[in-house]
Amino acid sequence: ARGNATLPGPSEVDLRRLPAPKGTPASLADAGTPGSNNFAVSGALTADGRAIVADDMHLGLRAPNVWLRARLRWPDPDAPAGQADVSGFTLPGLPAVIVGSNGHVAWGFTNSYGDYMDWRLETPCPVDGADDGCAPAVRHMEQIEVAGGAPVAFEVLETAWGPVMDTLDDGRALSLRWVAHLPGAINLGLADLALAADLDQALAATDRTAIPTQNLVIGDRNGRIAWRLLGPIPVRDAGCPQRLPLPG
């Protein structure tokens, strides 16, 4: 029948027939490798014709927790039947549900593990002037508030390529360019997914969305599913090395 997958029986899959792994239980313990997974099932394979979306971002538990479950409801002429109603997980202060469903579409993210960063070896100019061949740099002094203690000053050195992440013994610095740091790479277009009535509207909303690049799956109540990378992708010159830092 539609949506009823045939599961293998014990005559086909019996884990007791497999050889026992060698070693002690302690040596065989899971190392806890980080990861995440998601999938979408077309309505052609489900019992009622609606798509199924599953998403496990493998995020750790904290106290206080960073991710919160939430349901948002408000009247909106752009929402189905004029009423937005979305449930899922979000971050405090963000006016959008990051992953969830509005009853018409459901969506989920995992890390895309793409190559979105480029490093550059540079020699930042000294504070008291500019040397030949050095990279002009700006120093930002950030103040980090500490609960129950005095604030901590944190200096960030930034060149035209990006923030300096490390300094080598010879004085050269590794600066980072990440597509998510570029102008226009981040916006709140994700909030429009709450108003989508079907897959086409959801994909149109993602066309207007800019976040650090994620692996996105979507499904709708009509049984349609989609996958795409959501977020900016770097456009590199042909001679740009991808395995080593760019020379300064």
Where are these regions (language model features)?
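Mature extracytoplasmic enzyme cores
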Residues: 1-248
